[in-house]
From Swiss-Prot:
Signal peptide as annotated in the record: none
Molecular functions (GO terms): iron ion binding
Protein name per UniProt: Probable Fe(2+)-trafficking protein
PANTHER family according to UniProt: FE(2+)-TRAFFICKING PROTEIN-RELATED
Protein's job: Could be a mediator in iron transactions between iron acquisition and iron-requiring processes, such as synthesis and/or repair of Fe-S clusters in biosynthetic enzymes.
Keyword annotations of the record: Iron
Family per record: Belongs to the Fe(2+)-trafficking protein family.
Keyword Iron: yes
Listed InterPro entries: Fe_traffick_prot_YggX (IPR007457), Fe_traffick_prot_YggX_sf (IPR036766)
Length: 87
């Protein structure tokens, strides 16, 4: 499997096997983010969608997730909603 130096975990890890999003952002994620970090983002994204009851048809919700994704993957910020609790 191809390796990538992951911006989130600051180490060489397995790359995402496909470009996860279209366009330049998708290329950047594919080149700079590991599969481990991408899977962690997908789990975190699910928490955000459920806790904030986001409607993914709305542009505002999509923009919110895009901003949170950038924070999570490239800035190391992983903030869970206040009301969230692990079961």
């Amino acid at each position: 499997m191809t390796k990538v130096f992951c911006k989130k975990y600051h180490q060489e890890l397995d790359a995402i096997p496909f470009q996860p999003l279209p366009g330049e952002l998708g290329k950047k994620i594919h080149n700079e983010i590991s599969n481990k970090a991408w899977q962690a983002w997908l789990a975190h994204q699910t928490i955000l969608i459920n806790e904030y009851r986001l409607n993914l048809i709305e542009t505002k919700a999509k923009e919110f997730l895009k901003e949170e994704m950038h924070k999570f993957l490239f800035e190391g910020k992983e903030e869970k909603p206040e009301q969230f609790s692990e079961i």
